[in-house]
Regions:
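Short intrinsically disordered terminal tails
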Residues: 1, 125-128
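Acidic, low-complexity, intrinsically disordered interaction modules
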Residues: 15-120
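A short beta-strand micro-motif
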Residues: 3-11
């Protein structure tokens, strides 16, 4: 499976310090993202979720940017903060994107970060 860097990654990776430009392609080997032969991170790591996205459909940059827009919108502490979260919690179709470990706290699961664009657009349009 192919991944793409949707936001420049200049940080420590498993292989050491790296500087991966936006738009760079990576591939998966045994659950790890590989760039120029170097192991970068696990495909289920926070670094992967914040900088890299599944790109097998050619929409990796859009997917990555949408996940980050959703997270940012939900984190915004304004008068509509709770209303946005209530919309997420009340939509049973979104439970497939919630981690199961917590009954009273919403954490996005691996499926959210790999979701189809139409699902991510649905979530974003619901809360924007």
């Amino acid at each position: 499976m192919e991944y793409i860097c949707f936001r420049r990654f200049k940080d420590n990776a498993i292989c050491g310090k790296v500087n991966i430009p936006k738009g760079s392609l990576l591939y998966i080997d045994n659950g790890y993202l590989i760039y120029n032969g170097d192991v970068i991170c696990a495909n289920s790591s926070q670094n992967c979720y914040e900088y890299f996205s599944r790109n097998d459909d050619g929409n990796g940059i859009v997917r990555g940017e949408l996940t980050q827009k959703i997270i940012k919108a939900l984190a915004k502490r304004d008068n509509n903060y709770q209303k946005r979260w209530d919309k997420i919690w009340s939509d049973m179709s979104l439970l497939k994107f919630k981690r199961d470990e917590f009954d009273d706290y919403w954490l996005w699961n691996h499926e959210f970060y790999n979701a189809d664009i139409k699902d991510l657009e649905y979530i974003y349009n619901k809360i924007k």
